[in-house]
């Protein structure tokens, strides 16, 4: 532990006498931070880190600590640990790297993005020169060896996807792989108690085997459809952006996600926004079977042949004399069966039924029975004028017409609808089933959970 630097960093944090003082961490302290994920910016954290470092140095030799450090640091391109970095940048084992390639990796550590060999080869080359010169200055390298390394043409390896079965792009991993990585990373932390950094290191450098649920043939077909721009409208939307799309295909009986795609067109990077799992949108009328008609049937409020009045009820809501709710085509048929209301997606019928079901029962049904986790019970938002407004999805409009506060994901909507197919049983969607460690032991057994969401009678009516 460098007490002078540590104390100096602490004083600088309190007094702010320099903007570029640095963190004052030794390699041991940085290793502690990587292992614990303790990144709090405070004097207390620095002292806690220093004491942990002292304890670590009592039990391990310096070379062991350096090895652990090299196995945990980030090298960019989602590579944690020098072994994974060697695979990522050069598709080689660590022992196979040349001196120049080692210098390229060592140079990346200071700025994993800015010195990324794949993204910025020229910047990495400049940094590589600094590393080699420093090795000479420290007596670890001869000038002759440095000159030879400088002449070497260092090229990053590019994954063509030929050995991976990943058809989404020649360079980037698939949206499905992205989703699995995110889920396994989250589960390593929530189920096994790993810090984020420890989970990342284990995921990328720990030799894990992950059994996924993907069907390569189905995924390849989905990829081809989404990557063909002829399948999408050509112009910009009213907000100046291109219309987007995403898709999830799930086995309703097992919960296994067989394929997914997270956005229009070819994928443009690893771990980019996945609109199938990470984006929440108001579903509009697609919410009606989940929040209106299935609970209405289950609670005996309606039958498929029940008759309701297809007409606006309230002429004061909009303030322009037009009744509410209104159908999209502004046409009304008077006495109408539930079946017709569903077939034509009539807002008037949906509001009528939801009023009888009750908004709280509808909300509970969607969240507890059919797995919609992002519906909002109550949320305060500060408006532009400084006032605070409370939003809630436990209301007529959100639950009957899908204008939700946060929205829902395509993945959760897919799982909710699957209950109508699976005899009224809701099954949690899964992207992988097992994670094995490098010795073949099961780390995570991720089996889907199936619960009875509705009676078979309701299910039969809905189908």
What are these regions (language model features)?
Residues 1, 135, 222, 255, ...:
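Active-site SXXK
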Residues 2-5, 80-82, 142-145, 297-317, ...:
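Short, well-structured active-site flanking segments
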Residues 13-41, 162-169, 302-362, 396-399, ...:
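Conserved catalytic neighborhood of penicillin-recognizing serine enzymes
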Residues 19-216, 220, 384-388, 398-402, ...:
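Non-catalytic, structured segments within soluble enzyme domains
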Residues 98, 200, 216-251, 340-342, ...:
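Beta-lactamase-like hydrolase cores
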Residues 154, 161-169, 374-440:
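Active-site-proximal helix/loop microenvironment
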Residues 212-235, 247-249, 260, 266-279, ...:
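A penicillin-recognizing enzyme superfamily signal
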Residues 243-244, 268-290, 304-307, 398:
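Short active-site loop at a secondary-structure junction
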